[in-house]
């Protein structure tokens, strides 16, 4: 088939590369426009656009995919299908209807669970033991279209969202190309999503990433892993924001108040609503990340001080 790939962040690259290496003809990519990035806030190409530039593939960057110029170019290219991974914009019906086989989306959850922008983060945050990826027909609803195929992946006890997303990006690439092959062969079958089991996964905010020391230790651990690497778990110490690396629940730890710090010879503990957690890395504003023990010595944590 003749295809145009729609996607924006780095997580879309494995699928884009797989499509480019498949039996299908990659005509162009559709991605979000250049956006400010870095401390200098200069305009930066999306990872998908940068990949396409290196490969000599045409790049389409409509501010909105309903723009007449974009729709005209889409019609002129005449794709049979548009595979999508994390494009980042709502696609209007007029664009969805242009390819013969529509737009086919790779989503990183087992639909209908975790529809929305942050399915992997919510799977980790809510303690799911099993997640996966789904390829479905894009329609106007939020991730509501019929599903062509799925794959599963176990969520490990130490998995961060970044770990899980990287695995799903690569395994999902194979699922997406297999669905494209089946569509071309006429063997693809899309099944409606179940009515039961629907959950939503809105984007996690910086406020969501603030550690809640009044939660049980297992929930603190989940929040830290869910928000790693983005938006980045954080807390405050002496009214200054600090970022946190991994934490480990300590089942036999001493009794501490929520957020209360205890500095021992080889570890730093912080209290929760249940048992404490061991801090991994800490990064103060303007500083590099360092082991929690080094941080505690540097700031001279005193008895009774807390993270908040």
Curated annotation (Swiss-Prot):
GO terms for molecular function: methionyl-tRNA formyltransferase activity. Its EC number is 2.1.2.9. (6S)-5,6,7,8-tetrahydrofolate binds at residues 109-112. Keywords: Protein biosynthesis, Transferase. One of its GO terms (cellular component) is cytosol. It comes from the Bacteria. InterPro entries: Fmt, Formyl_trans_C, Formyl_transf_N, Formyl_transf_N_sf, Formyl_transferase-like_C_sf, Met-tRNA-FMT_C, Met-tRNA-FMT_N. Attaches a formyl group to the free amino group of methionyl-tRNA(fMet). The formyl group appears to play a dual role in the initiator identity of N-formylmethionyl-tRNA by promoting its recognition by IF2 and preventing the misappropriation of this tRNA by the elongation apparatus. This is Methionyl-tRNA formyltransferase.
């Amino acid at each position: 088939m003749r295809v145009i790939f729609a996607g924006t962040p780095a997580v879309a690259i494995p699928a884009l590369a797989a499509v480019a290496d498949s039996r299908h003809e990659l005509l162009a990519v559709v991605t979000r426009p250049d956006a400010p990035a870095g401390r200098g806030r200069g305009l930066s190409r999306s990872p998908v656009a940068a990949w396409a530039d290196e490969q000599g593939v045409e790049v389409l960057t409509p501010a909105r995919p309903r723009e007449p110029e974009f729709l005209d170019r889409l019609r002129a290219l005449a794709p049979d299908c548009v595979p999508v991974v994390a494009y980042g914009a709502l696609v209007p019906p007029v664009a969805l209807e242009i390819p013969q086989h529509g737009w086919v989306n790779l989503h990183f959850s087992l639909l209908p669970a975790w529809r929305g922008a942050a399915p992997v983060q919510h799977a980790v945050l809510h303690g799911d033991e099993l997640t996966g990826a789904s390829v479905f027909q894009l329609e106007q609803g939020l991730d509501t279209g019929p599903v062509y195929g799925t794959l599963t992946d176990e969520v490990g006890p130490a998995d961060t969202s970044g770990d899980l997303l990287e695995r799903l990006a690569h395994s999902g690439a194979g699922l997406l190309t297999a669905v494209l092959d089946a569509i071309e062969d006429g063997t693809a079958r899309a099944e409606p999503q179940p009515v039961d089991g629907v959950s939503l996964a809105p984007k996690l905010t910086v406020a969501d990433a603030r550690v809640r020391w009044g939660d049980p230790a297992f929930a603190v651990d989940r929040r830290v892993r869910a928000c790693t690497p983005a938006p980045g778990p954080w807390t405050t110490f002496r009214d200054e924001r600090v970022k946190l690396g991994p934490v480990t629940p300590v089942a036999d730890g001493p009794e501490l108040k929520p957020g209360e710090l205890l500095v021992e010879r080889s570890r730093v503990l912080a209290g929760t609503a249940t048992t404490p957690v061991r801090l991994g890395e800490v990064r103060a504003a303007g500083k590099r990340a360092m082991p929690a023990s080094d941080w505690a010595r540097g700031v001279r944590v005193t008895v009774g001080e807390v993270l908040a």
